[in-house]
A protein has these predicted regions:
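Acidic/His-rich structured neighborhood in mature extracellular/periplasmic domains
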Residues: 132, 139, 148
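Short coil/turn motifs at secondary-structure junctions
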Residues: 15, 136-138
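Histidine-centered divalent-metal-coordination microenvironment in nucleic-acid enzymes
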Residues: 118-136
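Terminal catalytic/cofactor-binding subdomain
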Residues: 1-116, 147-165, 184-201, 205-211
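Hydrophobic, small-residue-rich alpha-helical packing segments that form membrane-like cores
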Residues: 136, 162, 166-174, 180
Length: 211
């Protein structure tokens, strides 16, 4: 039997000028998180530092076994470990419901939208939907794992990806371009839609980083 889980990062879109004058997406994300923990009592906030970027009360464990927290200004949700894909989808939908309920409680459901997101249109960064595969350290990663996983990770964009409207106009290979942050998302007849959201951002077949 295998366990599975999912991690989702939510972008905050403020569609109302009235709300935008009072809140930024970052502060609104914190407001929603605090409302869920304090008013709706969905779980227990962390009492201690978990990391340099995760101070006390930045987030916490939910009573359903998952976690909800603020990561670099946006709401992030991690499901509990699940034994079936049906349960996994149910827990992911539960996160959507929690955010909608908070917006409803705060009276801003028609003014604010939380969307599952893995592209930052301001900085050009890509993130989210991390996956973990438990294997022995004795397994040669580059010789076994990469050849086995790479075709799956690439082709699943076709049948399981959400796609993307438009394209990103930053050259990831151009250091001067990146420093200038010449970032824009455009929709044109030339590139109206892409199958994969991250195609404009990924420049390496694999990247290894230990935190």
């Amino acid at each position: 039997m295998r366990i599975c889980g999912i991690e989702t990062e939510y972008g905050c879109l403020i569609e109302s000028e009235r709300v935008a004058r009072e809140f930024s997406p970052d502060t609104l994300s914190i407001l929603v998180k605090d409302h869920l923990f304090y008013a709706n009592d969905i779980g227990l906030l962390d009492a201690q530092y978990r990391d340099r970027g995760e101070p006390p009360r930045n987030g916490g464990f939910l009573y359903n076994g998952g976690r909800l927290y603020i990561d670099m200004g946006h709401v992030e949700y991690a499901s509990p470990e699940c034994l079936s894909l049906r349960d996994l989808i149910a827990y992911e939908k539960a996160a959507d419901f929690l955010l909608l309920q908070a917006l409803e409680d705060l009276g801003i459901r028609d003014d604010v939208t939380f969307v599952r997101n893995n592209i930052d249109h301001v900085t050009g960064a890509t993130f989210g939907y991390h996956e973990n595969y438990l294997v022995s350290r004795d397994v040669p990663f580059e010789y076994y794992m990469v050849p086995a996983l790479m075709p799956f990770l690439v082709t699943r964009q076709i049948y399981a990806g959400a796609g993307r409207v438009g394209f990103h106009e930053e050259d990831p290979y151009d250091e001067d371009d990146r420093r200038r942050r010449r970032v824009a998302t455009r929709v044109t007849d030339e590139v109206p839609y892409q199958i994969a959201q991250r195609s404009d951002h990924i420049v390496a077949d694999q990247y290894e980083w230990v935190q």
